A protein has these predicted regions:
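Short beta-strand immediately N-terminal to the Walker A/P-loop
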Residues: 30-31, 80
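The feature captures the beta-strand-to-loop junction immediately N-terminal to the Walker
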Residues: 33-35
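Helix-to-loop junction immediately C-terminal to a conserved catalytic motif
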Residues: 48
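Conserved ABC ATPase signature
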Residues: 130-134, 138
Length: 155
């Protein structure tokens, strides 16, 4: 389903990812582990095209996504939960979820607000609170929930 083949990514002159290759078959779960600065976040950002690999290929569900715009990668069904909390602080929890909503995708779970409130009961209790009123942990829950509202086939 996801294939990363010999990607090389840089920040300026710093060569962060060197010929990185791996495959994640459909239905598998993979974790990226490593020390600080090992390239875990850069790997995820390179897959999503938030950091453009200088070389190599990234293929998702048979589509080459190297060089694509990040929003087009997301439309293909790749969900991304950023490390840093990314919510709309002036919107309520419920409004943040609505912003992330996408049509159902074949082969993917169709997430609803109620399913996410069952998964994150703290958010259910705060559905009418603005994002800026949430704790850091609740903001991260909301970031994850909003990603799932996009009905990605891969997170």
């Amino acid at each position: 389903m996801l294939k990363v083949d010999k990607i090389n990514s840089f920040y300026g002159k710093a060569h962060v990812l060197r010929d990185l290759s791996f495959t994640v078959p459909k239905g598998n779960v993979v974790a990226l582990l490593g020390r600080n600065g090992a390239g875990k976040t850069t790997t995820m950002k390179s897959i999503m095209q938030l950091v453009r690999p200088a070389s190599g290929t990234v293929t998702f569900d048979g589509h080459s996504i190297a060089g694509s715009q990040p929003h087009k990668v997301a439309k293909l069904g790749l969900g991304y939960v950023p490390e840093e909390r990314r919510i709309f602080t002036d919107l309520t929890v419920a409004e943040n979820l609505i912003v992330g909503k996408q049509p159902p995708r074949e082969g993917a779970v169709t997430w609803t607000e109620e399913m996410l409130f069952d998964l994150f009961p703290n958010l259910a209790e705060r559905r009418n609170n603005r994002g800026k009123a949430l704790s850091g942990g609740e903001q991260q829950m909301l970031t994850i929930a909003r990603t799932l509202m996009g009905n990605p086939s891969f997170v």
